Amino acid sequence: MAKIAVYDINRNQVSERELSDEVFNAEVKEYLIHDMVRYQLAARRQGTSAAKNRSAVAGGGKKPYRQKGTGNARQGTIRAPHFVGGGAAFGPSPRDFSFKLNRKVKKAALRSALSARFKEERVAVLNDFQLEKIGTKAVVEVLNRFELSNVLVVVGEDNRNLELSARNLPHVKVLKAEGVNVYDLMNHRNLVVTEGAVEQLEGALG
């Protein structure tokens, strides 16, 4: 099993722990990560864009003029696409962009993403990340001690002070272990995770 140092928020090493190879040192399968990111982004799409076609536009039920004898080209409705005020030809219609991925694929993709960050040496484990009070400055100071920016922070339990302190920081996001996902792991260069969150991740993915 891989080993990693455990620090407190002052960057003092307090212990060392083993990480599950199955979760943090697995083979990195980039195609799974790619599929999972596509899956997450597709599920976010609204898919509400729409345009009225010739049957949806109001009016146009009556033939504008007789078929022959006027010198004009024959027309059946003034709501055809080539008329001003007519319906759109092949315009967008509401659709659902989401698609399905198997649960095994989702878990394997998350293991690959966690392993990728670990192999890049972009994972820091803290024994805890409790703040005495709400304050953005406190979070900045901790991250500066570790010389980290663009960080995903994963905690094992509700940490309201940390969540409120970090939400005003660009490129810093706080998630509970149960909410960790491939997109956020890939969208942040560094991962800071508490020991409690490590145990939860290993329990869920191991």
From Swiss-Prot:
One of the primary rRNA binding proteins, this protein initially binds near the 5'-end of the 23S rRNA. It is important during the early stages of 50S assembly. It makes multiple contacts with different domains of the 23S rRNA in the assembled 50S subunit and ribosome. Forms part of the polypeptide exit tunnel. Keywords: Ribonucleoprotein, Ribosomal protein, RNA-binding, rRNA-binding. Residues 50-78 are annotated as: Disordered. NCBIfam families: rplD_bact. GO terms for molecular function: rRNA binding; structural constituent of ribosome. PANTHER family: 50S RIBOSOMAL PROTEIN L4, LARGE RIBOSOMAL SUBUNIT PROTEIN UL4M. This is Large ribosomal subunit protein uL4. It comes from the Bacteria. Gene3D superfamilies: 3.40.1370.10. SUPFAM superfamilies: Ribosomal protein L4 (SSF52166). The gene is rplD. Part of the 50S ribosomal subunit. GO terms for cellular component: ribonucleoprotein complex; ribosome. GO terms for biological process: translation. The keyword Lyase does not apply. Belongs to the universal ribosomal protein uL4 family.
